[in-house]
Amino acid sequence: MEEFRRAYAKLCAAPQEAVLRRLRERGEAPGRARLDLAEQSLSLETCGALGRLLPGAAHFAEVALGDCGLSEDGVKLLLHGLCSNSTVKSLDLKGNNLRTTGAEALGKLLRQNKSIRSLILEWNSLGVWEEGFSFFCQGLGANNFLQRLDLRNNQINHHGAGELAMALKRNASLQELDLRWNNIGLLGGRALLNCLQSNKTLKKLELAGNNVPSDILKAVEQAMDHNRDRQTILSETQNRTSVLSKEILNLKDEKTKQFLDLMDTIDKQREEIARSGRISAGRVSQLQEALNEQHSIMNSLKAKLQMTEAALALSEQKVHNLGELLSATKQEQASMAERHFAELQQQKQEGADREGKLFRDLSASNEKNLFLRNQVDELEKKCKVQQDQIFQLKQDLTNTTAELKLRAVQAEERLEMEKRRFKQSLEDMESLRLKEVDHLTQHMEASERSMQDRVQRLEAIRIALEEELSQVKAAALTERGHAEEELIKVRNQARLEEQQRVEHLEEKLRLMTEARDEAQNCCLKQKQMVGEAQVKANQLNLHADGLRRRIEELQQDLNSKEQEKVTEVNKVKVELQEQIGHLQAERTAQEGLREKIAALERQLKVLSSNHREALLDKEGEISMLMEKLRMKEADISRMKEEEAQRASILQNAIMAYVQGSSLGTHSLRK
């Protein structure tokens, strides 16, 4: 506010002290979003400075310029500055006696400004200048942002009301219009009532103090009630559609998140399967290397077996040589028996000992040969068993690898099938949801259009009935007025005639009294004249009685007309009650439609809950598939552990066999 005050003082050659003091007071006040210069007489220079400052130098939400005595040029400069302003929401210009130039500037402001929501123009006499007010109404019709307009005490006549009605037909944002204490009259009220058939946004229209009939005021109030009900229904439907769209977007986000999580878990499972495949391939390669090592060990065992067979052949050769030596010794003994007979006993003993020793050695060598043969047989059996085990392990390994590959392929196929089925189910559910939403929206739009048509028809019928009622009332009033005028005329005429006759009789009586004084001698003549006068008086009385009877007949006619009027009014009331009953029936039908809308919303909620249950079922199926995958992984890990156990058992058996064979070779060497 201080910057605004300095800018104002800089722009004005002679700034107004009252304006500076008001700006200084407002700058010290806590609320700085309001420019309040009410009841300050602003000069033309001040208006020009404010018009230059308002577009961008100040950020005010409210501008109060009431009772400032603004001139035409000052108003033009101020409103020209507000045309490009985008922060002012409320403008107060009451009590400034705006004229044609001001009205045209207001129309231009309403055409160009897009931020003003409230405009107060009380006590300005805008309706006096028809051209300026028509320009203002054109600007109001082109504006789609103003929500509240105050036009109290502006001397607006029925022509101005017609211009306002034309503007309201084109305006789609104004919600409150105050036209109290103007001169709108019957024609202006009807024009405003007719414009309300096309304007559905106006919620409040004040017409007090405008000489507008009560039936038109009631019709305007009913139209306002219809507009308010329509706005509430539209706001409720918009809120519900926004809530439903948000829920649908949330469901879509949840579905996409769940699908992405599922894809991530599937990718992780694939990675784990690939890693387990790589690990199993590494283990298979390790087992292949172990088999190769076993083959090399078998080759070494075969070489050792050949060596043992060679050693066995050498031992047999030794046995053969020993047999030859035994035969040679026998021959030598036989040849030397003759020469050494003396030494025979001693040599016999020695020979027997040697023979026993040789026989023991021979039996020991035979036993060793048998033991070695048994070991060779056992080794051959063990080799065959190990070959069978190796072959069985190879078959088991190939079977397990084939089963693993088959299970992996089946798992991938199942995953692909589940993906396709899940995608298909998602697409089907999405298409069904879209179809249901479209059907509901179409049904709601059709029902809303039918309701609007019914409301318009009922409003037209109501307006026609009100016009007929007003016409009947006017006709009854005119007839009653005519009857009263005729009765008054008849009464006046009877009174005049009676007065004339009374005056005439009085004159005659006066003449008779004068004649009695003058003509006492003519008593008979006077008596005759008195008799004639009595006869005439009787005739006059009879005529007066006839007039009274005529008056009574006229009174009876008037009473009959009153009764007819009452019957007509009762008939109109009955018809109005019937129309009200029809309107209430239509209202009940509308309530039924609302209940149907609520039922449809409940069905939509049920469908959304079913959709959520289907999603939960899908999540359960996904969890079951995950559990199956986990069980398959557990089976694979168990089979891998069994293979590792078998490999370790085979390795231990081979190591035991190798250790046993090495012990056998060491014993043979010994």
UniProtKB/Swiss-Prot annotation:
The keyword Repeat is assigned to this record: yes
Superkingdom in the source lineage: Eukaryota
SUPFAM superfamilies recorded: RNI-like
Repeat region (LRR), residues: 87-108, 115-136, 145-166, 173-194, 201-223
Compartment(s) where it occurs, according to its Swiss-Prot or TrEMBL record: Cytoplasm, Cytoskeleton, Microtubule organizing center, Centrosome
Coiled-coil portions: 234-645
SMART domains, per database record: LRR_RI
Keyword field contains Protein biosynthesis: no
Stored PANTHER family: LEUCINE-RICH REPEAT-CONTAINING PROTEIN 45, NY-REN-58 ANTIGEN
Quaternary assembly: Homomer.
Function statement: Component of the proteinaceous fiber-like linker between two centrioles, required for centrosome cohesion.
Protein name: Leucine-rich repeat-containing protein 45
